[in-house]
Amino acid sequence: MSSPISAVSQMLERNQALFVGKRLLVCGALEDDYPRQLATLTHSLTVFTTDYCYYRSQQAALGDAILFDHQLGGAPRFDALLLLMPKAKAEAQYLLAMMTPLLEAGAELFLAGENRGGINGADKLLAPYGDKPVKRDSARRCSLYHGELSKPVEPFELDSWFGRYQCQAGDTELTVLALPGVFSASELDLGSQMLLASLPAMQGSLLDFGCGAGVIGSVLAKRNPGLKVTMVDINALALESSRRTLAINGLQGEVWASDVYSDIQGKFGRIVSNPPFHAGLKTFYAATETFLAKAPDHLQSQGSLTIVANAFLRYQPILETHFKRTEVISSDAKFKVYLSKV
């Protein structure tokens, strides 16, 4: 059964004639079943997503037409691109730089998104690739822009898109590499700083949930030689960033995609996280609540969960429901660090 489609997709439904018969590549902030409709209109459809949760929700319906990864390569083979505007402008630039080499000369460029989400910067985003785009539609506080690939494009070079900075967490210095739009892409956030300052020496096995650029897991791996570190995230750009952060610091760890605990087997001595609570432009608690509630099932006996969260988020009642003991081990006006034991 299909789910309700977003306001952006409702606007696109009004303009479906634009996609008929196209060899269409779709990417960006995908969040609903609308690509299934596109599959019935186009000559061929390829959906590229960096969101493992979305990939899992659509893979059965779309099959080989949907791809999950941090990059897409190959020869030019598409005559149209539909980019659904991501929250981060830098991520939109990354996707355009990656996808335009896969387009034939003269291919059509479509950008769609919510007005409050940066879509009205389409002129500047598309300027490197062609003339000024036309606004095709504006509805439900969303806009659709239409341009043409009329300028030559450079081959996509993944390495040039990694940001790099030095991170200091207590006595531990780390080099961080991160792709656009990834959490902790440009600096160590204050919440993660508080979390890392609250953690003791550790051994055994550790799960870094929602790893972002890999800062938390990498700092703990560097502080605790012999600690077996596993990092998971739903974002393919975060996963590749974490792999690079581990590698550049000479650290070992396992990194893979998991939708909460979907791909996690075995149990850990510790789970540590600065859990995400935003999805796109919307605050999103459900995945984090599932993460907290199911954590005891993935902890060894005497295992523990340590998280940092914005002080206004009501996570303590959830933790107290599912763990034998929960305490706040550090806090200030903005953040709280919770330690929960099974």
From Swiss-Prot:
What Gene3D superfamilies does the record tag this protein with? Answer: Vaccinia Virus protein VP39
Please provide, alphabetically and separated by semicolons, the GO molecular function terms listed in this UniProt record: 16S rRNA (guanine(1207)-N(2))-methyltransferase activity; nucleic acid binding
User: Where does the UniProt annotation locate this protein?
Assistant: Cytoplasm
Stored Pfam families: MTS (PF05175), MTS_N (PF08468)
Keyword Membrane belongs to the record: no
What Gene Ontology terms describe where this protein resides (cellular component)? cytoplasm
- Identify the EC number(s): 2.1.1.172
Q: Which InterPro entries match?
A: DNA_methylase_N6_adenine_CS, Mtase_sm_N, rRNA_ssu_MeTfrase_C, RsmC/RlmG, SAM-dependent_MTases_sf, Small_mtfrase_dom
The catalysed reaction is:
guanosine(1207) in 16S rRNA + S-adenosyl-L-methionine = N(2)-methylguanosine(1207) in 16S rRNA + S-adenosyl-L-homocysteine + H(+)
Record keywords? Cytoplasm, Methyltransferase, rRNA processing, S-adenosyl-L-methionine, Transferase
| Protein's UniProt keywords contain Methyltransferase | yes
Identify the domain of life: Bacteria
Q: How does it assemble?
A: Monomer.
Q: What family, per the record? A: Belongs to the methyltransferase superfamily. RsmC family.
- Describe its function: Specifically methylates the guanine in position 1207 of 16S rRNA in the 30S particle.
Kindly give the HAMAP family that the UniProt entry links to this protein.
16SrRNA_methyltr_C
Q: What protein does this entry describe?
A: Ribosomal RNA small subunit methyltransferase C
The source organism is Aeromonas hydrophila subsp. hydrophila (strain ATCC 7966 / DSM 30187 / BCRC 13018 / CCUG 14551 / JCM 1027 / KCTC 2358 / NCIMB 9240 / NCTC 8049)
Tell me the organism's taxonomic lineage: Bacteria, Pseudomonadati, Pseudomonadota, Gammaproteobacteria, Aeromonadales
Q: Which gene encodes it?
A: rsmC
